[in-house]
């Protein structure tokens, strides 16, 4: 659970060089390598369960940063902050890792499953409760804003990605 993984990961200040690439079904944006596989790198005799759990949370955060970087590269738009909801938004270690990996503030939704809130906003606009989607979404306020407090090693992340890629060459060569 988000709570349990936070408790475990919070026992150490960092992952001690352990990296996890969450490519359990290959890698999507921006890598598009269906033959990539989940990879755990940098384990030593001193690696603890807490280091591995923190590395998993940081790996997921790095994938989020990959997607933000892809959006910025494709659109040339500046992404000033990230808004998140869902179960992982209740994991302080993950939220901080996401802020650190993206180098952006992360705004945590007060509603854990905000998909329903978005549907409510659209319904409200459809029945003229709000005159526009901007008016509706202006009513949303984050429950918390988390700022980056250190930089995660994106160069080491890119090295980990390169090691996870092309694990199954026949799948890696697929192009859609």
Enumerate the predicted regions with their spans:
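Glycine/Thr-rich phosphate-binding loops that ligate phosphate moieties of nucleotide
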Residues: 1-176
């Amino acid at each position: 659970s988000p709570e349990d993984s936070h408790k475990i990961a919070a026992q150490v200040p960092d992952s001690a060089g352990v990296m996890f690439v969450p490519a359990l079904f290959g890698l999507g944006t921006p890598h598009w390598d269906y033959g990539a596989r989940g990879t755990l790198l940098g384990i030593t005799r001193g690696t603890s369960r807490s280091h591995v759990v923190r590395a998993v949370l940081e790996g997921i955060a790095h994938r989020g940063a990959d997607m933000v970087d892809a959006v910025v590269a494709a659109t040339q738009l500046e992404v000033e902050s990230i808004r998140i909801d869902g179960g992982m938004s209740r994991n302080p270690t993950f939220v901080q890792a996401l802020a650190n990996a993206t180098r952006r503030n992360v705004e945590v939704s007060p509603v854990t499953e905000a998909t329903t809130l978005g549907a409510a906003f659209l319904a409200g606009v459809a029945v003229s409760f709000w005159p526009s989607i901007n008016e509706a979404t202006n009513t949303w306020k984050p429950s918390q804003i988390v700022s980056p407090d250190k930089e995660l090693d994106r160069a080491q992340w890119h090295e980990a990605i390169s090691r996870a890629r092309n694990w199954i060459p026949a799948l890696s060569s697929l192009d859609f």
